[in-house]
Structure formats: structure tokens, C-alpha cells
Amino acid sequence: MKTKHIIIVTGLSGAGKTTALNILEDMSYYTIDNLPLGLEKSLLDTEIEKLAVGIDIRTFKNTKDFFTFINYIKESGVKMDIIFIEAHEAIILGRYTLSRRAHPLKEVTLLRSILKEKKILFPIREIADLVIDTTEIKTVELEKRFKKFILAKDGENTDININIHIQSFGYKYGIPTDSDLMFDVRFIPNPYYIEKLKELNGFDEEVKEYVLSQKESKEFYFKLLPLLEFLIPQYIKEGKKHLTISIGCSGGQHRSVTFVNKLAEDLKNSKVLEYINVYVSHREKELGHW
């Protein structure tokens, strides 16, 4: 029996691939870390239905080997997803300093090793179904992201062209570095300064009504949705499998949350876009900022 679902976990050394595999193991996936390339057939022959396989730069000599591995699995017809784990260079530097472990590329400096690996793995990042930046993500939030992604994939059409992650954030806490497209909605009047709305958030009807009724909001959204309905098919044509759209306001509680939820719903129901998988996250809520 062929495996029902194989998840390939790859990415930058020190970014958290082992943590990712541990989370998937807790989600009932049988995990294999650092699988040598060339054992593709054994993955397909096993009767295990849910497999998560860790592959990193130690495993392959060049990205061509990785793509050969991936294409072999794809051609078998087995359902497969690629999750790419990354983090900011400063975070990876700090993690290596604490662990006192050597980077697998062993360049003159640790930073050079990190930057070289980032460059080598860029083509793999581009075809990933899910890209996660662990710079500011706690393990609990990482688990939530995985669950959202996998639950969405379980009910999807097998002809899905692209996975679209739409996230809200607050600029006061820093910008999300995994963004492909970023929109700043701080030009819209802030509900935070209205006493009865201050403690509410973008899920509350009063906040949604206030934000979306603003003249600036209407004009912005009138342009935003058609722009994305144009851009997304272009990304699909270029072979992009994952797109992260970030919308930010001051605290990531009112305006950005409202727009993310509305945009996600409208993209799902778009008559222009077909076979897309849309899922949402609200960074500041997940980090406990509201």
C-alpha cells in the first residue's frame, strides 16, 4: 500500500526542523529525520499512511538531487507536501552559539555558512507548500500553524494550484519576514482610540462595521481584491506553490484582523480564482498580545 501522505520537512540549519518533526510526530505522523536520498522507493513501499521526512543540506550534494527525489515521489501519485523552515540570520547565529554545534557547511565564519545555505536552498523554498519563519514563533503557535495547514489540505481538491497564507500583524511588534506581499492599513482611522472599541478586536461586529465603513477602507479594498485576483494567477504560472500575504496595522488587533478575515473569505469565494487553498493566522493573537 502506498503512503497516503508524505510531508517533506526541510529548510535552514538551526531554524527548527527537529522541532517541526516532533510536532508532526505528536500529530500521528511517523517521522524520519535526515533521510539519505536514494531511499525514495522505501518510502513508497511502506504501509505507513502518514509520514514526515526531514531532509537537510547534509543529505544532498546539490539541489538537483533534492528535485530528483521530489519528482520521483510526485510521479508515483502519492500526496506530498513540502514544508520549509527558516529563521532570521541573527536568531540562527544565537542558536548555534548556545548549542556550540558546528554548521554543516563549515565556512570561514558561521554567518557565511548561514548565508551560503540560504542561497543554496532558495530554489527549494520557492516550491514549498508552506514556508514558516520561526524567528518569533513559539512551539505552541508552530503546532497551530501545522494543524491549520494539514486540516485545510485534508479537505482539498488534489488539483490545488497554490496555498495562500493570509496573516495579520502589528507593526509595533515587527514585520513578519516570511511575507511575499505586505499591505499597511495604518492609514485607516484606528478603532483603538474609540473607547467602546478599544478592548475589542477585528472579529467583533462593531469593529468590522467601523473599519469597513470608512471611505479609505472601501477605496483600498476596491483596489486590493482585483489586484490579488490578477497577481495570484501570475504566481501560479511561475510555479509558486505558497504565497504569504501580510496585512499590518499598529497593534495587529483591529484593522489588520478585519481585512485579513474579509480578504480570506472573498478569495475563497472568488469567481476568478480556482483551486486555491486559503488559510489564516493572526500573529499578535497567537503571541498573546491581545
Curated annotation (Swiss-Prot):
Keywords: ATP-binding, GTP-binding, Nucleotide-binding. The keyword GTP-binding applies. SUPFAM superfamilies: P-loop containing nucleoside triphosphate hydrolases (SSF52540). GO terms for molecular function: ATP binding; GTP binding; molecular adaptor activity. The lineage of its organism: Bacteria, Fusobacteriati, Fusobacteriota, Fusobacteriia, Fusobacteriales. GTP binds at residues 56-59. It comes from Fusobacterium nucleatum subsp. nucleatum (strain ATCC 25586 / DSM 15643 / BCRC 10681 / CIP 101130 / JCM 8532 / KCTC 2640 / LMG 13131 / VPI 4355). Belongs to the RapZ-like family. The keyword Nucleotide-binding applies. ATP binds at residues 11-18. NCBIfam families: PRK05416.1. This is Nucleotide-binding protein FN1089. It comes from the Bacteria. Pfam families: PapZ_C, RapZ-like_N. Displays ATPase and GTPase activities.
